[in-house]
């Protein structure tokens, strides 16, 4: 009898052990399956992130002059390329120095982001009915925009009457000239204004075909180093606003791009702040200047991207001036320039 009870006990133990083993195997299998499902979901999420935009190429304007430090740092460090490459988007650059060419490229869709466009150009384009919006600021630097001449007798607006003055149209430099002339009740029609890029204007001044060159940044610095006469700079005349612009349509249709662009700009700003010496060297190499020259000019710039009330006032001042000087046909409210979020 005792043996029988012992046999039954052994059987029960074996059964319990077997059940426990089955339960453990089942739990392990379920855990493995859950982990596999999680890995699959994560892989799918990563794939979705990479394909979250239907764009295959994104084109930015690339302008290093007058002293566009964020632009130089961005390309040198490949920040846009990495940011958007992770999304499967190719990054391309359009080297357009004329404000008119930049805004036209945005309107045609050849360029998606104007990465450093003058406030004058933005206002002129918007006033003519184009879809263009300020996403954020790029820089402010009135003292960096200058009028240089070899003729030291050119010290007043009146002394410029009939002179050949060259510089890029639709830009802060264009506004500087018109503003300077306006202080004496003159208009751009009182001078022989020639539309030229900054390098070409400086070359014209060097060669003698131009009386006054509208220059900025490194070119202005070099003109001063050559002993050329500073007729005027933008202090008290212009705000020298430069912005980052897109179309409202692009902003509405591609929020994922806008978000990544803002992150990339933060990365650029962080690099400039955390690595000032390296920043100066990179810019000096790009512009073929010594680092002391870059540091001297850098102090003239405010590269913060936030749009402030002062910036908006600056835009309005520029718009009012453009209307009064006949650059635009009707008074313009700059509040319509900013993104409708």
Question: What residue ranges belong to the model's regions?
Answer:
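Short loop->beta-strand "edge-of-pocket" segments that line small-molecule binding or catalytic clefts
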Residues: 58-64, 158-170, 270
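Flexible hinge/capping segments at coil-to-helix
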Residues: 149-164, 252-256
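Extracytoplasmic "Venus flytrap"
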Residues: 52, 58-76, 170
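Bacterial lipoprotein signal-peptidase II cleavage site
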Residues: 19-43
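Pocket-flanking alpha-helical
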Residues: 68-74, 94-131, 143-157, 173-175, ...
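Secondary-structure end/capping motifs
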Residues: 253-327
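Ligand-binding cleft/hinge of the Venus flytrap
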Residues: 73-89, 174-193, 224-225, 281
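Pocket-lining segment of extracytoplasmic ligand-binding domains
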Residues: 120, 190-194, 199-283
């Amino acid at each position: 009898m005792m043996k029988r009870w012992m046999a039954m006990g052994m059987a029960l133990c074996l059964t319990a052990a077997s059940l426990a083993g089955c339960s453990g195997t089942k739990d392990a299998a379920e855990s493995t399956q859950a982990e596999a499902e999680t890995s699959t979901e994560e892989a799918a999420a990563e794939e979705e992130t990479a394909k979250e935009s239907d764009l295959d190429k994104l084109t930015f304007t690339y302008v290093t002059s007058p002293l566009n430090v964020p632009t130089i740092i961005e390309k040198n460090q490949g920040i846009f390329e990495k940011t958007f490459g992770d999304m499967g988007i190719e990054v391309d650059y359009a080297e357009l120095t004329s404000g008119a060419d930049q805004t036209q490229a945005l309107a045609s869709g050849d360029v998606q982001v104007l990465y450093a466009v003058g406030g004058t150009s933005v206002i002129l384009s918007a006033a003519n009915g184009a879809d263009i919006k300020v996403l954020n600021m790029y820089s402010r630097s009135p003292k960096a925009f200058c009028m240089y001449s070899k003729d030291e007798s050119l010290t007043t607006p009146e002394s410029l009457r009939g002179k050949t003055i060259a510089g890029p149209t639709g830009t802060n430099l264009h506004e500087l000239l018109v503003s300077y002339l306006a202080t004496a009740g003159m208009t751009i029609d009182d001078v022989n204004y020639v539309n030229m890029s900054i390098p070409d204007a400086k070359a014209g001044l060097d060669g003698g075909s131009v009386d006054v060159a509208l220059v900025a940044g490194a070119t202005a610095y070099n003109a001063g180093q050559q002993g050329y006469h500073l007729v005027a700079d933008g202090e008290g005349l212009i705000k020298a606003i430069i912005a980052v612009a897109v179309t409202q349509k692009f902003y509405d249709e591609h929020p994922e791009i806008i978000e990544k662009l803002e992150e990339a700009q933060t990365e650029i700003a962080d690099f400039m702040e955390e690595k000032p010496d390296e920043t100066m060297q990179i810019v000096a190499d790009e512009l073929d200047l010594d680092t002391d020259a870059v540091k001297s000019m850098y102090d003239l710039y405010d590269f913060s991207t936030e749009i402030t009330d002062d910036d908006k006032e600056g835009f309005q001042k520029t718009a009012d001036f453009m209307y009064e000087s006949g650059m635009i046909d009707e008074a313009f409210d700059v509040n319509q320039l900013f993104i409708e979020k």
